Design a protein with these regions (language model features):
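Mixed-charge, Lys/Arg-rich low-complexity intrinsically disordered regions
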Residues: 2-29, 34-38, 45-48, 120-125
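Charge-rich, low-complexity amphipathic helices
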Residues: 17, 52, 61-63, 95
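Intrinsically disordered, low-complexity boundary segments flanking structured domains
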Residues: 28, 57-62
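Generic detector of isolated residues embedded in canonical secondary-structure elements
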Residues: 38-40, 72
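Short, solvent-exposed secondary-structure boundary/capping segments
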Residues: 48-57
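Intrinsically disordered, low-complexity, charged/polar segments
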Residues: 63-125
């Protein structure tokens, strides 16, 4: 019979509960649940990694949890393009198939035959 010496199921459960897998991936087009903007994901933080000042500037009633993935987006709304930092709980997959017009998208990504975005090979080296 194998020994379970050194095995701490409580610790393992705690570590697993703290390990998050991002729901979205680089190059995916997502939209915000509440606000009218969308964008291409260009970076992912496994949990909140911005300033406390930025976090506190969000109204308390809509402030997201810090213990979840946060996504950097090349974002756009009806008026302009910008960089957004959004919690996973506030994102949905954008299924419109429309290209994102943010000017930096073409610097980092190329479109594939299906209309998705994949990182440019030159950036992977």
């Amino acid at each position: 019979m194998a020994s379970s010496a050194g095995h701490n199921p409580g610790l393992c459960d705690w570590v697993m509960s703290k390990t998050r897998v991002a729901q979205f991936k680089l190059g995916q087009v997502v939209r915000h649940r509440r606000f009218a903007f969308r964008g291409v994901i260009f970076d992912i933080d496994p949990e909140f990694n911005n300033t406390e000042e930025w976090y506190q500037s969000i109204p308390a009633e809509v402030r997201p949890r810090k213990d979840q993935p946060f996504y950097h987006l090349f974002a756009e709304n009806a008026e302009t393009e910008y960089i957004a930092y959004v919690s996973e709980q506030n994102l949905l997959l954008d299924t419109s198939g429309e290209p994102v017009r943010h000017p930096q998208v073409a610097e980092v990504f190329e479109r594939d035959a299906a209309g998705g975005y994949r990182p440019r090979v030159s950036l992977l080296h």
